[in-house]
Amino acid sequence: MKFTRYFLICISIFLWISCGSDKDVKDILSKSDALLQSNPDSAFTLLESVEELDVLSDETFAAWCLANANVRDILFKEPLSTDYMLRAFNYFKNKGRINEQARIGMFLGHAYNASQQRDKAMNIYLVALDLADRSQ
């Protein structure tokens, strides 16, 4: 009985922390979006302040990747890792709008290109181009 109670308390605390983390990141995403055009360096700093990416929901993680990739592109910084971008691309492919799929595809192509995976970059760029054409 004690074990069950302890287990339920631990699960409750974990869920409370996880949900709080998503809410905090969503606030950061909102603030960085407001700063993007006028102050992209500040938007980048805000996005980079997110530390525990592995506890975020897939939706929040994908939104963070898209925002971070966008600001990195504006500031001419290295792309995020292909692992991050592929996870975000798969989320948007299944649950995102077509324009989000096209944008994340372009950024995934940038990540592949930066990691010297030219064939994968070219293939995903073609997919992103097709998605962008269909979104108009």
Model-predicted segments: where are they?
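A "functional boundary" signal
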Residues: 5-9, 16-136
